[in-house]
Amino acid sequence: MTQAAVVDLVGGLDLGSVARWEAEVGKAASTSGTVVLDLTGVDFLDSAGVHGLFRILAALDGQGKRFGVVAPRHGRARRLLEILDLQSLVRLCESRDEAIDDAA
């Protein structure tokens, strides 16, 4: 299995927290070629958070990093991302192992 840096996004992903998460993901990306964003603990996600999430993913892609996104089927983040039909842009995985395999 690929050695991946995992970033647990916990709590709200919104205008007030996006910069902190961008910094955390940037730090993780500096240590690994594969980054997994685990949204399991996200309990609030607004439009600024969705925009920030895709800005983070675009930055990883621009750096040539592989990435996976964990958003369990019954989680809050998954429901919103599906309502917005964003799973057509990024694959949402059920587990970290699945996300790591998907990123490989």
PLM features: what roles do these ranges have?
Residues 1-8:
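Short beta-strand/loop segment at the start of cytosolic alpha/beta domains
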Residues 91-104:
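A charged, well-structured terminal subsegment
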